């Protein structure tokens, strides 16, 4: 919801401004609930579905930045750093059978947004130390979607699209001549190609996959 509020605030059309004004009170409530909840959240939720903490923080940060809500931005940033800064040598036990988020890559994308460039590069080297040799392999191979009419299995197309988004964003951590940038962008392209053609065609995916496709493409 906060991501929707952020997108509406970015648009200059009269319709967007009207919708943004209508949504603003609810966005403020969500912001306050984040501020109330984050101090209680001792541990992050690392699953590959709706409850993933890194995903929530990443989207909420968009709103905090666009709305100049420095209190929310600081709370989100400090919590993400506290949860994830000591994570090293990620094993990436994924995908799960109904994942639509990569726990590993979503964490890496979240940390990209809360650390400075130098600090993030150091953190990422520790978190994915074998990225230069495309390991863990599971992060580089698109998930197999065996039955797109199954609501849970169809989630895996979302996983491929969200991985494409994360890989493309993570690639920004390195200069253009760094081989790891090429590796990350290649992984993004591979995942996008695997699932973008299936955004439509089966209801179990087509009523939501377009949102993930937009993240992967924009």
Which residues does each predicted region cover?
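Eukaryote-skewed repeat-based solenoidal scaffolds used as protein-protein interaction platforms
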Residues: 2-135
């Amino acid at each position: 919801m906060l991501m929707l509020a952020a997108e509406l605030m970015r648009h200059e059309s009269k319709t967007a401004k009207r919708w943004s004004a209508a949504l603003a009170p609810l966005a403020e409530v969500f912001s306050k609930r984040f501020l109330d909840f984050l101090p209680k959240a001792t541990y992050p939720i690392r699953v590959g579905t709706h409850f993933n903490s890194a995903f929530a923080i990443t989207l909420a940060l968009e709103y905090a930045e666009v709305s100049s809500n420095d209190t929310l931005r600081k709370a989100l940033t400090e919590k993400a750093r506290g949860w994830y800064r000591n994570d090293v040598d990620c094993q990436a036990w994924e995908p799960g059978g109904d994942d639509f988020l990569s726990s590993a890559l979503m964490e890496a994308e979240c940390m990209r947004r809360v650390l400075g460039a130098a600090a993030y590069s150091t953190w990422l080297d520790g978190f994915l130390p074998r990225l230069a040799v495309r390991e863990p392999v599971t992060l580089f191979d698109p998930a197999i979607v065996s039955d797109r009419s199954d609501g849970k299995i169809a989630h895996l197309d979302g996983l491929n699209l969200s991985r494409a988004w994360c890989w493309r964003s993570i690639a920004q951590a390195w200069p253009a001549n760094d081989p790891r940038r090429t590796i990350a962008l290649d992984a993004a392209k591979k995942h996008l190609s695997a699932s973008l053609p299936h955004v439509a065609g089966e209801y179990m995916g087509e009523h939501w996959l377009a949102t993930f496709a937009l993240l992967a493409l924009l």
